[in-house]
Amino acid sequence: MALKIRLARAGSKKRPYYHVVVADVRAPRDGRFIETVGSWNPVLPKDAERVKLDAERIQHWIAQGAQPTDRVLRFLDQAGIAKRPSRNNPTKGEPGKKAQERLALAKQAEEEAAAKAAEAAAAAAAPAEEAASE
């Protein structure tokens, strides 16, 4: 039986409240669970009352093979119960391939326009110099 430590939604409409539960992965999100090991109230400001966790029981279930979900793992990392691996995605902020192609084309067109403008300026200055030297 595969176990997850995950969030089960409670609370009313537009007023979310979550229980941190240990449940079988096949069980419905808000349905059957094995044990409640904490709670999270996202409506509260960021303080100690916002996330409540039973560290001893969570460590017990992790030792039994329960896997925390991403959001729960964030809470466990903040509480110092479990370590969340850091993510490294250095290309996240870069534009996509097509956007990079468009930027390269725009830069090339800009360079060509600048070269033509410089060439035209040089051509315009050249006849004036010839007239002055005669």
Curated annotation (Swiss-Prot):
Gene Ontology molecular functions: structural constituent of ribosome
Record-level GO cellular component terms: cytoplasm; small ribosomal subunit
Keywords: Ribonucleoprotein, Ribosomal protein
Biased composition (Low complexity): 115-134
Disordered as annotated region, ranges: 79-134
Keyword Ribosomal protein: yes
Gene Ontology biological-process annotations: translation
InterPro entries assigned to the protein according to its UniProt record, in alphabetical order: Ribosomal_bS16, Ribosomal_bS16_dom_sf
Keyword Zinc-finger: no
UniProt-listed Pfam families: Ribosomal_S16 (PF00886)
Highest rank taxon of the organism: Bacteria
Family of the protein in this entry: Belongs to the bacterial ribosomal protein bS16 family.
Protein name: Small ribosomal subunit protein bS16
Organism, as annotated: Brucella canis (strain ATCC 23365 / NCTC 10854 / RM-666)
